[in-house]
């Protein structure tokens, strides 16, 4: 059946899960390496170092933390959408790519300190997660 064929291959939506898993590390890398102070000594306790940051570097780390919070929900939505089989693969792929785009925009908004816009982008991303469930019902 088409459902089993779809489960047996790495769809674009599945690749988006992989991207979502690694995307939060962009925040950590930005916070650590695009400013002064991070080196071998700071690497002994990187969480302590990150807790001392301020401004855009602190926001970059906060974006990372939010990425870790939302990724499990996105991964679950993609997996369940594939298993349910109620939606065309192209639609699942489009929703998953849109979610990744929303996460990149979220990171940019967080880094720039655009709180209200960041919140709207966050809601859009959560809506895309919900949409993955709804279209597959």
What is the predicted function of each stretch?
Residues 6-30:
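Long, highly hydrophobic alpha-helical transmembrane signal-anchor segments
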Residues 32-61:
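Cytosolic, membrane-interface loops and tails of multi-pass inner-membrane proteins
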Residues 66-80:
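Core segments of transmembrane alpha-helices
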Residues 6-15, 79-94, 133-137:
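Helix-coil boundary and interhelical linker segments in multi-pass alpha-helical membrane proteins
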Residues 19-22, 97, 101, 120, ...:
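Hydrophobic residues within alpha-helical transmembrane segments
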């Amino acid at each position: 059946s088409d459902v089993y064929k779809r489960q047996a291959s790495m769809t674009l939506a599945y690749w988006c899960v992989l991207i979502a898993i690694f995307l939060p590390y962009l925040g950590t890398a930005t916070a650590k390496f695009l400013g002064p102070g991070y080196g071998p000594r700071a690497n002994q306790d990187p969480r302590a170092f990150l807790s001392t940051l301020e401004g855009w570097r602190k926001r970059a780390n906060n974006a990372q933390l939010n990425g870790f919070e939302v990724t499990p929900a996105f991964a679950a939505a993609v997996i369940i959408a594939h298993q349910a089989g109620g939606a065309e693969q192209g639609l699942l792929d489009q929703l998953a790519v849109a979610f990744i785009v929303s996460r990149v925009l979220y990171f940019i908004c967080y880094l720039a300190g655009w709180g209200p816009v960041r919140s709207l982008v966050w809601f859009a991303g959560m809506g895309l997660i919900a949409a993955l469930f709804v279209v597959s019902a």
